[in-house]
Amino acid sequence: MDIVYAIFTCIVSLLFICVTPVLVLVLRIYVGKTIRNPNYAPVVGTLFHQLFYYNRLYDYQAEVAKKTPTFRLLSPEQSEHYTTDSRNIEHILKTNFGKYSKGKRNQEIIMDLFGEGIFAMDGEKWKQQRKLASFEFSARVLRDFSCTVFRKRAAKLVSKELLMRCSLDSIFKVGFGVDLNCMDGSSGDDNEFIKAFDDANALTYWRYVDPLWKLKRFFNIRSEFFLKKNIKFIREFVDELIRTRRKQLEMKQDSMDKEDILSRFLLESKKDPEKMTDQYLRDIILNFMLAGKDSTANTLSWFFYVLCKNPLIQVKIVEEVREVIGNNMKDNGRVDDFVATITEQVLEKMHYLHATLTETLRLYPAVPVDGRCADADDVLPDGFHIRKGDGVYYMSYAMGRMPYIWGNDAEDFRPERWLKDGIFQPESPFKFIAFHAGPRICLGKDFAYRQMKILSMALLHFFRFKLSDDMKVVTYRTMFTLHINEGLQVCAVPRRGLVEA
């Protein structure tokens, strides 16, 4: 009997230990959050709702937004406001830009991975990185050089079908001046880097819904153990990249020694080595790497997915390629001969392709959710109040599916919505928010379009694509970027003969 009582006591004690923190957490969530005040956005749930719907989080947000364009989820520290109202988005990203920042909570969550890079910073460090990077993205030489790099990578890609590696190769060469050569499959570290980077991305994002992540980090267990392991590998990989590029610049072996982003930051580090440390350089590179690799590779993956689901659109793009480049370039020609014809002038004429890529980004934005934190009390254009410390998030993924933004066919993939008399017509960046907007608008927008156009033109000219398994459900992995879960499996059928480069 004593043994039974002892076991019962232990069980009750364990339950008390486990349940009490949860009850305290719930109490903290609901106390003082103005739940029924009509001046504040309606509450539709708490942190635990995001945890429950985590594997389909962005679709859950879209379902809620169709009924309530601006809503709140409660967390222990503050209210988290979510919106698809373009007026609110313009307000926080442009009109009242100075009243919003990344916020302490966001920085605390992402600091281990992104450090003091451009995505995690505000103020002077953000301005410094953006200013230096803007010189490169606006330079004519980068445009010409990036076209050359993208064409070379595209020629390899047609032969080897290595979409993610091609994107990473291009980013490393154009952005950092280093030939990664991961398309050649010569280095296992390159494959490990891609996996470590994606896993670290997902594990860091998990912190937003894991109330115990700080405890796990302290004890170095479960998700935090794997995150720490991945970050260690990533840092070592990027540190080696910095050392390699620094040696190249010192030896002056690279004719493009000042025409990439990393080189400009390395030159700046010589002027002020105390501020521009190698650790700071590493943070900068990781942030630009996330922007470059994931925006293009993920978008192209979704692009080919929707093309497989809509074969007629594939045909239209191929017809446009032939019309713009000319029928003298045959399907059974050499790959390098074909990509050599893809000039800047050719890219500018590819209106239907541009519309199709943009339609892909509308429904499958590279960053599905992003946001800011209020540094002062505020009132959004839709009338809802924001308290100091509250988060305000705009849902790019959900916005692309809102009938009150795009019409009743919002969920249909229709490139024609972007065309008028065959000419591409852009929308307000606060309505089409895939590249952010306001002072923090994406510097690499044109860079990304250029790379995606060249790669997709090369692939579609030589191949017809279809899904390997039409019955398999394609979905995303919940993380900072919209990554296809387990990758996209497609069959590439040659249109005619193919002579490799």
Q: What are the functions of these language-model segments?
A:
Residues 135, 418-452, 477-478:
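Cytochrome P450 heme-thiolate "Cys pocket" and heme-binding signature region
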Residues 311-314, 392, 445-483:
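Cytochrome P450 heme-binding "Cys pocket" and the immediately downstream C-terminal segment
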Residues 167, 171, 175, 231-238, ...:
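Central I-helix of cytochrome P450 enzymes
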Residues 47-68, 233-236, 240, 334-382:
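Conserved cytochrome P450 K-helix E-x-x-R motif and the immediately C-terminal K′/meander segment
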Residues 394-423:
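Conserved cytochrome P450 K-helix/beta-meander segment immediately N-terminal to the heme-binding cysteine loop
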Residues 2-18, 74-81, 141-149, 156-173, ...:
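Cytochrome P450
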Residues 138-140, 201-202, 229-300, 327-346, ...:
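Conserved cytochrome P450 catalytic core segment spanning the I/J/K helices
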Residues 2-124, 128, 147, 151-155, ...:
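N-terminal membrane-proximal hinge/A-helix region immediately C-terminal to the signal-anchor transmembrane segment
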